[in-house]
Amino acid sequence: MKTRTNSCLLGTIALLVVLISACGSAQKKPADSVNAGITFRNIAVPGTTLAAYRRCVTGPEHQKRVNNKKRLFITMNDFTDEPMHDRGIPGVVIFDYNNDGYQDIFVSNGPCRPSSLYENMMGTAGKLEFRDVAAQAGLALPGFNANGACAGDINNSGYESIYVLGRNGPNHLLLNEGNGHFKDITQASGAEAGVHSHISCTMGDFSGNGRLDIAIANSSDMKNAKAIMKNTADYNQPNQLLQNMGGNAPRFRDVSVSSGFATTTPLPGQTWAIAAVDLFQNGCTDIVAGTDQGAVPMTKYGGGGDRGFIRVYKNDCHGRFTDVTRQVGLMSSPGAWMGFAFGNFNFNGKISIFGTNFGDFLLPMYGLPQNLGDLSSRWILQRPNGTFADPRSSTFKYPAKSGADPSLGGLHATPFGWGVAALDYDNDGSTDIAYAGSMDGMNGADADNPGTLLRNNGPKKLIKGFYPSFSYDPALANDGADDRRRIITGVAAGDLDNDGHADLVTAAQGVMVGKLTEDHQHFGSPFDDSRYLAEYTSVGVMSYKPAPGNTTDGTLAVEMNKGGNGNNSAAVRTLGAVGLVPGAKANRDGVGAVVGFTPAGLPTQLDPVVAGSSYASQNSLVQTFGMGKSRTGTLEVLWPGGVRNKLFDVQAGERITFPEIPCSYTDKSMSVRDYTSCVRGSLDALVHKGKVSGSMAARFTSSALKAFNEAHQPG
């Protein structure tokens, strides 16, 4: 194990410290990469509407960095006074805003350029192309300094509305009117959420009333970097929870404190990531939040303290939350947690977490002793008892002493990350991971993440029967987007052309201009070719002079998965039936449901329906499940409220709308007669209201009865 020392630093205590070429580690043979036979192609190329996107800077705040760059020398205090994310935090939301069956793309922007809504024209044009309709749809938000966003059907109208977050200002709630237009109901709804640095948001029905509430991750005043650099939480802002009070144009009330979510004792954390997910699969939507360690030494190094955690707020099913982070074992994993994705990565039937982090290629920070593995982007695995196992167990001095997986699934080291998505990009039936990101701050920008695509090696390659193994696939690095130079924040996944392959959309706050320098760190990782852009060079203790490197406005990439291995897939969209069927509880999007898919002969995949995760972004709510060479599979949905439904004989290539049937096949209290009556009555109502076809209702009825009979067999 290697601990790199202070003499190896170009920079100093910061969000970003890059290493000079003289600082190196012993050469190791890098881990092998894999070619899964899948290709990606970036279609946001010159001449397209997508290529016109440019992320706008934050205005006067950005000018501080510009002015510093013109000076002969600057000091650490000058860096501290610079804004955080001075080029903003562009978020990506993939959603079908007009219900035409094709996924559209929303990308936030800054005060000098409008946000974009890229309408997918495939249904009318017959080919994949996009047009920016933000202005006519009412989503341009001119002059608004936007960060992340999330979307959901807040009034159960059948259309997804969108919530866009403000930087050091209030948020905007845009109600989808169902006619291609959004109405700004921010003030009338009470959803402004005050003047905070709102970063990420997520929607979920926390109180179990069939309405989507909104949880917001807040950071600190982004006009300067004091929250990171001054080693104090005094600058941090508490997170928020807005409860949906109902109505066609819903009103919201702040229940942040009364719900138990916005814990401020002793002080709030600096939160980057948030997600509403039924983590324990009990029918109740919990909240997972990621906070940042910042420039504070970890406890194991004898000072400072641990403050950056994956925090879990467990829901009592009525909207009251308890912070169970310690009880589930996550206080042993401090870090700079920045983005979340969820899946059954190790095939044990539990929902586990992948968290992006500072990575292994930017350490150590000046004066902060660090070991390989402390800040790895990595998976945190849920055990059968509801606690979590960290393969790196960073409270131990060395990962190997935890008895876990010191090789981190064979990758050894992982790069920096912001946005992340769990997806089965090669449709082999195993959940993979894609993430991206770069930190631009202080004396440079890191370029260690070329576009990370981690292929899950499957159930036969588990380590110690529990820890998954992953291989790096360079397919994203080779798609033409040049993600290594793009300072990516927003990442979202969805099938944009309905071809059965999950695509990726990434938004960058900036693009690096100038020579990238190799930092010569070698861990035996496929990411050992890490680089950085020097914007300043050290000329003494706490003194720096400008270097040639700089950044320019960020871009958008739409990275289309072209397949290539012949594997099959199926797609599913959940349809909650509250207000449509007596006894139904699930919101119209089915947000909070957990969908399981078991292809014939393969393990079960789990994909929770999450309206806002990653970093400042949101995946499509339409889920794509890989099937390998299987031709059939079984879908199972655990709905908010705890009802379970099944559909057998799902065929390869099918696109299923799965409605909530408010009668659980696992309910031991129901007779066959009562259960049959409930199923048929519910499906008849859904057919009558045009939500499912008669033929699909017959399939769901047959499957429901089969599932009930199987679950009630003696023994």
Placement of each model-derived feature along the sequence:
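Bacterial N-terminal signal peptides that target proteins for export
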Residues: 2-12
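C-terminal motif of bacterial Sec signal peptides marking the signal peptidase cleavage site
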Residues: 21-22
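Blade-edge motifs of beta-propeller repeat domains
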Residues: 28-86, 119-144, 175-196, 228-269, ...
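Beta-propeller blade termini
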Residues: 89-99, 119-120, 145-156, 175, ...
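Acidic/hydrophobic-patterned starts of short beta strands in beta-sheet-rich repeat architectures
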Residues: 99-109, 156-165, 208-217, 281-290, ...
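Short, conserved, GDST-rich strand-edge loop motifs in beta-rich repeat architectures
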Residues: 217-236, 290-307, 356-374, 436-448, ...
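Gly/Ser/Thr/Pro-enriched helix-cap/hinge segments flanking short amphipathic alpha-helices
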Residues: 388, 465, 469-482, 501-515, ...
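Soluble extracellular-acting proteins and domains
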Residues: 661-715
